From Swiss-Prot:
It comes from the Bacteria. HAMAP family: UPF0386. This is UPF0386 protein RC1_1783. NCBIfam families: PRK13687.1. The lineage of its organism: Bacteria, Pseudomonadati, Pseudomonadota, Alphaproteobacteria, Rhodospirillales. Belongs to the UPF0386 family. It comes from Rhodospirillum centenum (strain ATCC 51521 / SW). InterPro entries: YjhX_toxin (IPR018654).
Length: 86
């Protein structure tokens, strides 16, 4: 699957325990997206365009109205990246 660098960075953050919080307007349409890492930092690579691409490819999903998390398909699409945490 062809995944861009911002999509790859977002998926990697989600695979390590992050989440995507969304904000909706009065018509229940998504107006803002925030990708929060496991450590609580905000990932700037995750914007509305990246979010829509990941959702349309079904690499992320939301359960019971909660934050968006990575799916099994998303985990399979993530390329391994070295982890500098020791």
């Amino acid at each position: 699957m062809n995944i861009s660098k911002p999509e790859q960075r977002t998926l990697h953050a989600l695979a390590r325990g992050g989440r995507i919080d969304i904000e909706k307007d009065d018509d229940r349409r998504i107006i803002e997206v925030d990708c929060i890492t496991r450590e609580g930092w905000r990932l700037l690579d995750c914007d509305m365009t990246t979010f829509r691409k990941l959702r349309s490819k079904r690499l992320i999903a939301s359960e019971n109205g909660g934050p968006y998390r990575i799916t099994r398909k998303g985990l399979a699409a993530v390329r391994p990246q070295p982890d500098n945490r020791s």
